[in-house]
């Protein structure tokens, strides 16, 4: 009978298991994953009947793009190892693959959910782009075809824009940190908009734009950012965080820059509208001026004098008609009525004549007043303008200008 010590048996088991299960693939459900401060990951993998403990060291874990969570279905690649002091075995994981979905896709969904929860995709936080962009920063590879495509569109559509090219890696393990630094640099240039872009490629090629460090740089930037990565069918984390998503780098330029031909046509249309509007305003103001001139003429002394003369003529005709009618109907009262009408006519005639004389004097005085130089006055005697030659010592006269009149007495008169 061969009797083993505990250590000997554990050693035999260790050698047997570790030599036989050098590379295994185990599928199961993750249970109680723990990220240790040392950087290692500890978890269990289970199915309906059994559980096996697993460990993944920091060096291998760094290559896993997603975060291991409780309940995930994984395919774990690794080897079996035995911890001899306790006689326990576990699976030392070297690779982790999600069941039914790729690792990168899972990492994408995890980061998308995380950033959405943090508010990175909120529409109310999106920064509006200026209506007319004067300066633009292109964060892309200086040697890539995407840059040449964007510069060509800029030249064709709106060559007046000033362009800053911020060179950066756009794929590879070192690309994401460099893209983040380039975005921060472009944000400090004071441009109107930043376009982060590259041409199409595989999911692995485009992956730097799915990294959290790039998402943070886009979200924290003060300048509006356009994400223009890959082709129209590619949707990346940078697209969701950016203020505007463009399907391609070329499309980004067409979306944010005006077309100079369309702008010239628009300016021509505006000029036509402005010219038509100015012509309309000129016509209206000309009509208003004509109305004002007519109103001013209607209020002039000459017009009022003509009005009174016309009124007197009309009244005279009406009175003659009235007299004729009365004479026909009351011939027996002719002598008496004739005397009354004669008196009335004489009185009315005198009144109207006085009004006419007064108006003529006012008109004359007004016309004369217009000839009076500034700070001078017109001399009036007995209601008529006179000169110094027409007055004598002791006469009382009025001194008048366009605003005031004053009574004066002539104390002396000497020839010059």
UniProtKB/Swiss-Prot annotation:
InterPro entries: Exonuc_VII_L (IPR003753), Exonuc_VII_lsu_C (IPR020579), OB-fold_nuc-bd_dom (IPR025824). GO terms for cellular component: cytoplasm; exodeoxyribonuclease VII complex. One of its GO terms (molecular function) is nucleic acid binding. It catalyses: Exonucleolytic cleavage in either 5'- to 3'- or 3'- to 5'-direction to yield nucleoside 5'-phosphates. One of its GO terms (biological process) is DNA catabolic process. Keywords: Cytoplasm, Exonuclease, Hydrolase, Nuclease. It is found in: Cytoplasm. CDD domains: ExoVII_LU_OBF. It comes from the Bacteria. It is an enzyme of class 3 (hydrolase). Heterooligomer composed of large and small subunits. PANTHER family: EXODEOXYRIBONUCLEASE 7 LARGE SUBUNIT. Belongs to the XseA family. This is Exodeoxyribonuclease 7 large subunit. It comes from Nitratiruptor sp. (strain SB155-2). The gene is xseA.
């Amino acid at each position: 009978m061969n009797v083993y010590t505990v250590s000997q048996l554990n050693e035999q088991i260790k050698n047997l298991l570790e030599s036989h299960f050098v590379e295994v693939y185990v599928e199961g459900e993750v249970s109680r994953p723990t990220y240790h401060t040392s950087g290692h990951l500890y978890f269990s993998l289970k199915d309906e009947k059994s559980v096996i403990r697993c460990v993944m060291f920091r060096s291998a874990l760094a290559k896993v793009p997603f975060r291991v969570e409780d309940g995930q279905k994984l395919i774990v690649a690794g080897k079996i190892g035995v911890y001899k002091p306790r006689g326990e075995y576990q699976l030392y994981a070297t690779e982790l693959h999600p069941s039914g979905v790729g690792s990168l896709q899972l990492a994408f969904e995890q980061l998308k959910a995380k950033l959405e929860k943090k508010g990175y995709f909120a529409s109310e936080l999106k920064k509006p782009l200026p209506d007319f962009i004067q300066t633009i920063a292109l964060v892309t590879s200086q040697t890539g075809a995407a840059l040449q495509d964007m510069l060509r569109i800029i030249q064709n559509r709106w060559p007046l824009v000033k362009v800053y090219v911020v060179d950066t890696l756009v794929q590879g393990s070192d690309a994401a940190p460099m893209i983040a630094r380039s975005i921060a640099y472009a944000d400090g240039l004071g441009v109107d908009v930043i376009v982060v872009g590259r041409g199409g490629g595989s999911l692995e090629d485009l992956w730097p734009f799915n990294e959290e460090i790039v998402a943070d740089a886009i979200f924290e930037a003060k300048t509006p950012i356009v994400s223009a990565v890959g082709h129209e069918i590619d949707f990346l984390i940078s697209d969701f965080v950016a203020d505007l998503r463009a399907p391609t780098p070329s499309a980004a330029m067409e979306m944010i820059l005006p077309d100079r031909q369309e702008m010239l046509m628009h300016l021509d249309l505006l000029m036509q509208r402005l010219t038509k509007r100015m012509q309309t305003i000129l016509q209206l103001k000309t009509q208003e001026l004509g109305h004002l001139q007519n109103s001013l003429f209607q209020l002039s002394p000459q017009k009022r004098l003509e009005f009174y003369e016309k009124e007197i003529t009309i009244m005279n005709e009406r009175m003659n008609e009235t007299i004729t009618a009365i004479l026909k109907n009351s011939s027996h009262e002719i002598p008496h009525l004739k005397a009354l009408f004669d008196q009335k006519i004489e009185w009315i005639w005198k009144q109207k004549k006085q009004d006419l004389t007064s108006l003529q004097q006012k008109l004359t005085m007004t016309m004369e007043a217009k000839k009076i130089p500034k700070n001078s006055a017109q001399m009036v005697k007995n209601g008529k303008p006179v000169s110094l030659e027409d007055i004598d010592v002791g006469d009382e006269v009025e001194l008048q200008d366009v605003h005031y009149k004053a009574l004066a007495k002539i104390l002396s008169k000497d020839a010059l």
